[in-house]
From Swiss-Prot:
Gene3D superfamilies: 6.20.200.20, Complement Module, domain 1 (2.10.70.10). It comes from Mus musculus (Mouse). Disulfide bonds join C1214-C1346, C1236-C1387. Glycans are attached at N340. Weakly expressed in embryonic kidney and brain. Not expressed in adult tissues and several cell lines. This is Kielin/chordin-like protein. Residues 60-92 form a coiled coil. Keywords: Coiled coil, Disulfide bond, Glycoprotein, Repeat, Secreted, Signal. It holds the Pfam family VWD. The gene is Kcp. One of its GO terms (biological process) is positive regulation of BMP signaling pathway. It comes from the Eukaryota.
Length: 1550
């Protein structure tokens, strides 16, 4: 029973735990009972209660067990119910896309996947029934929906709903001359380095020109930029030149200023002007303005008391903006904000477009579905375009932001016929390799070049680099384009993320971040002294150091005195202050004096004497007292007399104790030392640490005891440790002594009164990431990189990358790819274990080939084979068999086949018929590569007058075409714009004239809309005519009447003279008079044809009353209206050859330009038109010019006195404007304010011309404006004066003025234009702006203020002797003319001035605001072609110089007009004038209106017959603003008139 009950125990425990876990609320009640049961079970078997049986003990346990079994059964039932409930809930719903879905619900996560909720589980699968969900096919490969793949290393594509979307690399735009794509890269980079004067220079390097040491050049992004070295004026009398240097130097000495002495080379800031820095150079003080670093693009103005602008705000467009404040943006699609001196712009947010390829519409910011943007190109909606992808040709259409494409056949490359007969397609051979027509490739030996095959000629050009998105990119060796992986700053390369100090400005700390260097001024620590100092080359001021005993100590440092360690010193304000150290109190009363303090308790100082520890000595004043030294304390006691053995002791005078008459024996000592007396204490010689006593000749000794030392490191004295010094690590040190720690490196220890204290040596933080430790402190004079030390400027292999080469430079380590020698082959192989390519194999377009291996060309695998020869792939076409036909077409591999025909560059299918060669009038047919042709048969025409047009085979009937409407031969009609005129078509010629009325009745009636009076009723001569009938009313066969039915009322007669057709081109000898009963004359030969060559021309037919013009391949002849005459009919006559009658006064003069011209007098209107007065009428003739074709580097030009143009080299322009600013031929902007006469531009080689300007200060000192211009042409002198007055050889002339063949001067708008024979043009506005244009044939031959015109702006400051001058003022003064053409007057030389500084801050601010219009929308279209910044600076300069008032408006307009003139030259015409801004008044009463860029050759009465296109082509004058006639009117004698009232103009030949 006990065993069974024992077996129940584990079950009881298990059930109890289940019950307790299930019923948390009954734990407190059941747990004691269960514990009782367990404790009872585990208790000993004997009963502790007398008389209690085992049955009585187990009964409670069995009852509890039954209760637990019932509870467990109940728990199991509840558990089963819960599990069933969970299963039921799971089968009722699913978790869908972000929410629960009921049973049976269906949803689509994407366009090609469908999901269904079944039994609580989401079952998802593809939808193959949809066509676009079955995947994609690309280049013969199949891809599933959503699959991403890369057809090549630079393209990533994705299959989405049956459409393949591919995206190429995003390459930044480059700005260098040569670029290339490195192997394995997708984007081009700039080729590093520059070539200048026959030498190669590394990218970022700075160097002096070898031919001119006064030019400082730099190589940046493969371009060389040079600026003149500015030599400061030498402060000494005899400067010494140095070989190879530009500027002479003085011999060394110091400077004295007031009470201050400066050393040579020392710099300081002058008090009161923080921007002025002075320097002592060779005994002379030179001061200059501080150059502020450009820390941000738009810094705020300097704080009061400081010099340089700060980056805590922005100064933009003349306004101050705090950081974080919004600023205006020129791009309406961007929002800009000022951020710490920079302007950051973000595009405005755009809503998502409901189409896949939305496009951009001009004027809108966000893409919309009205167009398409596909593969980087914009297309209009419904526009169709073609693409070529991977050899396939696609035809695509844009529809509301969606692009759909379908494949089509690609056009066959045209082939040419060879001399031997078969047709061959052109190919290109470059460096022994053959390339097919139209293919593009990169030469392997020129990685930065892209080539293409065009018509059999290889065309190669440098790869253009995209602009990098950083300011200081680095161009790695071997790369074409710069990258932003590191920074090149001041010719040094820094790694990304590297902090460094600017080598040129040590007060700046810089940081390289993604190719852009951001610099900020070093924050100097606060100084505690009153007068901090700046040393040479020192950035931050610091307190002066102290010098004591020839040793230097920094400010604030505490240190022991070099010669007296008992003194502690400190450095303050450059002075060393010292005092005795504070001594610790001694732990004894009578210490010995130590090295510095009296606290040595190893002995006693008592009564003016020193005693060792333990010594007994008599009291200095009481001999009967005996004293003892005990660790610095003295104990004195009365002597105790020993008991005597004798009965009668004797007291000797001077002794304290009586003695027996027989004295005890002394104690002898070794050597010759004095014996020790009885009862005397002494120390044994050589053992000062033992104390002995002599007793009647016997010696007893005992060791002295030492007290504990009150310090940590006492030194050992003769017997006991002493705190007067230190014993540390086996070495003794004096108190106050400093020494290096023997245990810990770079720690310094101090011994003070027996204790040693060690602390780390203080070091300044290193300013580099890889410093080395020298003398315990980090130093940047070398590098500690990955545990290895390297010297500065040392190159070493990268321990982490075998193919990298690292350079240590001042504690910074920069690692780049190890440069490789260029391989001697074109397709080297890159082996993984080698850093550089090798020629022991070939790598050709991603395919590796062994030496001698032949394989198909990857670019043309079907038709070309390539062989690897010593690292270079040699590719050639497979040979083609000859074709057995005469006109084969290109087949596979461009081999000729006879399946179709190639004729005239086009392919024709077999059996196809086509037109023969142009002009052959043949019809051809293609049969198996053979072409047979037959001549066309023209159909017969029903008309007599036929014409065969050039380029056509068959003739056509010469009908008439007027205003786009065809009129048949012999027809007549009324023009819509002239109801009283009548036109007729006769033999292809249209003749129009006013209806000439004839009266057929006595009382004709004329209505308001009638052209001629009508006769009511259709009755004439007693006969009545029906509507539509016509008859001849009299004997004149030219008169005819027609009966016409009116809308209302009876019919009426309309009578007029017949209109005769114009006989254009009929010679007078061939004219036939009209026969009987005929009205019009005829011509015995064919009339003239209006061909394309004659379109726009005018001819005078035999009838002088008509003028004929060739339009739409049809002669249009109109009848001339004759003016009414005031003389009676009998005084009128018609001159032979003229149309209109004139009064019989052959001497009648003509009115021309406000003056009377005698009859018969002739004059020239311009170079192309001459006029004469004939009997009171002006007759003019105009010369016509042939079309002129100039080469690319030439432009049409006009010679003085010549009508027709000639080709001259393309010109360059130089301008002087404003106060005055000079923009040279090479584009440099100069400021020079001399008020004398100067050479502006001159032919310094051939002496062809010389242009001088005379400046005037207009009453303001230090500034000037151009007053007049003088042009010298050989012996002829022309002066262009104020108000557009012109003098030639001291005589005032009227414009236009011609002196053949040298000179022609004219007035266009408000601008005087001078044309001279060498191709020179001078434009003068009559106030202060002058422009000189010379052809490029004068390149490198000019001199003067306009520069030398050599294409290099940096050397424009050359004086007459050819030397570069340091300042613009000295340059301008060197070109002073000794005596001008005008009257002599006093003048002043130019000097360097800053009118804004003199005018003050308010004037500068107002000038900035007014000149800000240059950067606003009226000029925005010009900003891309002509940068506005130089003109903005010139405008501010001028407004400060002009001062307030009305003169400032003129100065502003001069600057704005100068910029607008440059814009017009670049092809952009800004519309910038307003009602209150630079208004130009025009004589409105004479019909003129202002035009910013009107036609330079306006329409006049003398050129109105010339077509507009021909007139514009032959007008080479510059576009100038001025007053023009509006459309529909022509200019004549200073008025705008209708063309109909112009005098007659007769056309002549060339």
């Amino acid at each position: 029973m006990a065993g069974a009950r024992a077996a129940l125990l584990p079950l009881l425990l298990h059930l109890g735990s289940l019950a307790l876990a299930a019923r948390g609320g009954e734990v407190s009640r059941e747990q004691p009972r269960l514990a009782d049961a367990i404790s009872q079970q585990q208790a000993p078997s004997h009963s502790l209660v007398p008389g209690e049986t085992h049955q009585q003990q187990w009964c409670p346990l069995e009852e509890r067990l039954e209760r637990l079994e019932a509870e467990v059964t109940d728990l199991r039932k509840q558990n089963r119910e819960l599990q069933a409930r969970v299963v039921q809930l799971e089968s009722c719903e699913c978790w869908g896309p972000g929410h629960t879905c009921p049973e049976g619900a269906r949803w689509e996560p994407d366009a090609c996947t469908a999901c269904v909720c079944r039994d609580g589980t989401a079952h998802c699968g593809p939808q193959p029934n949809l066509p676009h969900c079955r995947g994609c096919s690309h280049n013969g490969q199949s891809y599933g929906h959503g699959e991403t793949f890369s057809p090549d290393a630079c393209t990533t594509c994705r299959c989405l709903a049956g459409t393949v979307q591919c995206q190429g690399p995003s390459c930044s735009e480059l700005n260098c001359l040569e670029s290339f794509i490195p192997p394995g890269e997708c984007c081009p980079i700039c080729r590093p380095g520059c070539e200048y004067e026959g030498q190669l220079h590394q990218e970022g390097s700075s160097f002096l020109s070898s031919s001119n040491p006064c030019l400082q050049c730099s190589c940046l992004r493969s371009l060389v930029r040079c600026v003149p070295v500015k030599c400061q004026p030498s402060p000494c009398l005899n400067p010494v030149p140095r070989l190879g240097h530009c500027c002479p130097v003085c011999q060394a000495s110091g400077c004295t200023e007031g009470n201050s002495h400066r050393d040579h080379g020392q710099e300081w800031t002058t008090p009161g002007d923080p921007c002025r820095i002075c320097q002592c150079l060779e005994g002379h003080i030179q001061c200059r303005q501080r150059e502020c670093a450009s820390l941000c693009p738009y810094p705020a103005r300097p704080l009061p008391g400081t010099c340089c602008p700060v980056c805590d705000g922005c100064f933009l467009n003349g306004r101050e903006h705090s950081s974080g404040e919004p600023v205006g943006s020129q791009d309406p699609c961007s929002s800009c904000r000022c951020t710490n001196g920079s302007v950051q712009c973000e595009p405005l947010p755009c809503p998502p477009a409901p189409c896949r390829y939305p496009g951009r519409i001009p004027g809108q910011c966000c893409p919309v579905c009205d167009g398409c943007k596909y593969q980087g190109h914009e297309y209009r909606s419904q526009e169709t375009f073609t693409l070529q992808e991977n050899g396939r040709c696609l035809r695509c259409v844009c529809q509301a932001g969606e692009v759909s494409c379908e494949e089509q056949d690609c056009p066959v490359t045209p082939c040419v016929r060879s001399a031997s007969g078969p047709q061959l397609c052109s190919a290109c051979v470059l460096n022994g390799e053959e390339f097919a027509e139209g293919i593009q490739w990169e030469p392997d030996d020129q990685p930065c070049t892209s080539c293409s095959c065009q018509d059999g000629v290889p065309v190669c050009r440098a790869v253009l680099c995209s602009p990098v998105p950083c300011q200081h990119p680095t161009q790695p060796p071997g790369a074409c384009c710069p990258s932003c992986d590191s920074c090149t700053y001041h010719s040094l390369v820094y790694a990304n993320g590297q902090n460094f100090t600017d080598v040129d400005s040590p007060c700046q700390t810089c940081y390289c971040e993604d190719g852009t260097v951001r610099c900020s001024l070093i924050n100097c620590p606060f100084t505690t002294c009153a007068k901090p100092q700046n040393g040479p080359g020192q950035c931050c001021p610091k307190c002066p150091d102290c010098i004591l005993e020839a040793q230097v100590f920094v400010d604030g440092e505490r240190f022991p005195h070099p010669r007296d360690p008992c003194q502690e010193c400190w450095c303050q304000e450059g002075q060393a202050h010292c005092q005795l150290r504070a001594c610790p109190s001694a732990p004894c009363v009578h210490p010995l004096p130590g090295t510095c303090c009296k606290n040595d308790c190893t002995g006693c100082a008592f009564g003016g004497k020193e005693y060792p520890n333990g010594a007994d000595f008599p009291h200095p004043t009481d001999p009967c007292r005996l004293c003892r030294c005990l660790s610095g304390n003295v104990q004195c006691l009365a002597r105790r007399c020993p008991p005597l053995s004798c009965p009668q002791p004797v007291l000797t005078p001077g002794d304290c104790c009586p003695q027996c008459p027989d004295a005890p024996a002394d104690c002898p000592q070794s050597g010759n030392m004095v014996p020790v007396r009885h009862q005397e204490h002494f120390f044994q010689p050589g053992d000062p640490c033992s104390r002995c006593l002599c007793l009647d000749g016997s010696v007893s000794c005992q060791r002295l005891t030492c007290p504990p030392a009150p310090c940590a490191h006492p030194r050992r004295d003769a017997c006991c440790p002493s705190c007067d010094g230190c014993l540390y690590q086996g070495k003794e040190f004096a108190s106050g002594e400093r020494f290096p720690s023997p245990n810990v490196a770079c720690h310094v220890c101090l011994c003070w009164e027996g204790s040693v204290k060690c602390e780390p040596r203080t070091c300044a933080p290193a300013q580099c990431p890889f410093p080395t430790r020298e003398d315990c402190c980090p130093a940047c004079d070398s590098c500690d990189y990955l545990g290895v030390s390297y010297l500065s400027s040392q190159e070493f292999p990268d321990p982490r990358e075998a193919c990298n080469l690292c350079t240590c430079l001042g504690g910074f380590v920069t690692c780049t790819r190890r440069p490789c020698e260029p391989p001697a082959c074109s397709h080297p192989l890159i082996v993984p274990e080698h850093c550089c390519p090798t020629c022991q194999g070939c790598l050709y377009h991603g395919i590796t080939a062994a030496l001698g291996e032949t394989l198909p060309d990857p670019l043309d695998p079907t038709c070309s084979l390539c062989t690897c020869e010593e690292g270079s792939m040699r590719c050639q076409k497979k040979p083609c068999p000859p074709a057995p036909c005469a006109h084969p077409s290109p087949g596979p591999c461009f081999c000729p086949v006879c399946r179709s025909c190639l004729s005239q560059g086009r392919e024709h299918q077999d059996g196809e018929e086509f037109e023969g060669p142009e002009g052959s009038c043949e019809r051809c047919r293609c049969l198996a590569g053979q072409v047979s042709c037959t001549r066309l048969q023209c159909p017969s025409l029903p008309c007599l007058h036929q014409v065969t047009e050039p380029g056509t085979c068959c003739p056509r009937c010469t009908g008439c075409l007027a205003r786009g409407e065809e009129h048949p031969e012999g027809s007549s009609w009324v023009p819509a714009d002239s109801p009283c005129s009548s036109c007729m078509c006769h033999k292809g010629i249209i003749t129009c004239a006013q209806v000439q009325c004839v009266s057929a009745c006595i009382w004709p009636q004329e209505g308001p809309s009638d052209c001629c009076p009508q006769c009511s009723g259709c009755e004439h001569g007693g006969r009545k005519y029906e509507p539509g009938e016509s008859f001849q009313p009299g004997a004149d066969p030219c008169e005819v009447c027609i009966c016409k039915q009116k809308r209302e009322g009876p019919p009426s007669l309309h009578c007029s003279r017949r209109q005769c057709p114009s006989l254009v081109g009929c010679p007078p000898s061939q004219l036939l008079p009209p026969g009987p009963q005929h009205c019009c004359p005829t011509c015995a030969q064919a009339l003239s044809n209006c061909t394309e060559d004659l379109v726009g021309s005018e001819l005078v037919p035999p009838d002088p009353c008509y003028t004929c013009q060739c339009q739409d391949l049809t002669w249009l002849c109109t009848h001339r209206a004759c003016p009414e005459l005031s003389c009676p009919l009998w005084e009128r006559h018609t001159t032979p050859g003229s149309c209109c009658p004139v009064c019989k006064d052959p001497t009648q003069s003509c009115m021309h330009q406000g003056r009377w011209v005698a009859s018969g007098e002739q004059w020239a209107v311009d170079a192309c038109t001459s006029c004469s007065c004939v009997a009171g009428t002006v007759h003019c003739q105009t010369q016509r010019c042939r079309k002129l074709a100039c080469s690319r580097d030439e432009v049409p030009a006009l010679s003085p006195g010549s009508c027709c143009l000639r080709c001259l080299p393309r010109p360059a322009s130089c301008m002087a404007f404003g106060d005055p600013h000079y923009r040279t031929f090479d584009g440099r902007l100069l400021h020079f304010q001399g008020s004398c006469s100067y050479v502006l531009a001159k032919d310094c080689h051939g002496e062809d011309f010389s242009v001088h300007v005379t400046n005037d200060d207009r009453g303001r000192r230090g500034v000037a404006w151009t007053q007049e211009v003088a042009v010298l042409l050989g012996t002829v002198a022309v002066r262009l004066l104020q108000g557009r007055t012109v003098m030639v050889d001291q005589h005032t002339v009227t414009l236009p003025f011609l002196r053949e063949p040298l000179l022609y001067i004219e007035l266009r708008g408000h601008t005087v234009i001078l044309h001279a024979q060498p191709g020179l043009q001078v434009l003068w506005d009559g106030q202060s702006q002058v422009e000189v244009r010379v052809p490029s044939s004068y390149r490198g031959q000019t001199c003067g203020l306009c520069g030398n015109f050599n294409g290099f702006a940096q050397d424009d400051l050359q004086g007459p002797d050819g030397r570069l001058l340091p300042t613009e003022a000295s340059f301008g003064n060197s070109w002073k003319v000794p005596k001008g053409l005008g009257p002599g007057r006093p003048c002043s030389a130019g000097r360097e001035v800053d009118p804004c500084r003199a005018a003050g801050y308010r004037a500068r601010r107002e000038a900035n605001a007014r000149c800000g219009i240059l950067k606003t929308s009226p000029f925005s279209h010009c900003h891309a072609v002509v940068p506005p910044e130089p003109f903005f600076a010139a405008c501010v300069y001028d407004l400060c110089a002009c001062g307030p008032g009305s003169s400032s408006d003129t100065c502003l307009c001069d600057a704005l007009e100068a910029y607008a003139s440059h814009c017009r030259q670049a092809g952009v015409t800004p519309v910038w004038r307003g009602p209150t801004l630079c208004v130009v008044g025009c004589p409105v009463d004479r019909g003129f209106v202002f035009d910013e860029c009107g036609p330079p050759c306006p329409r006049t009465c003398f050129n109105r017959h010339i077509p507009l296109g021909e007139l514009a082509a032959h007008c080479v004058r510059p576009c100038v603003p001025g007053c023009q006639c509006p459309a529909g009117l022509v200019e004549h004698e200073g008025h705008c008139i209708s063309p109909e009232v112009c005098p007659p103009v007769l056309l002549t030949g060339d």
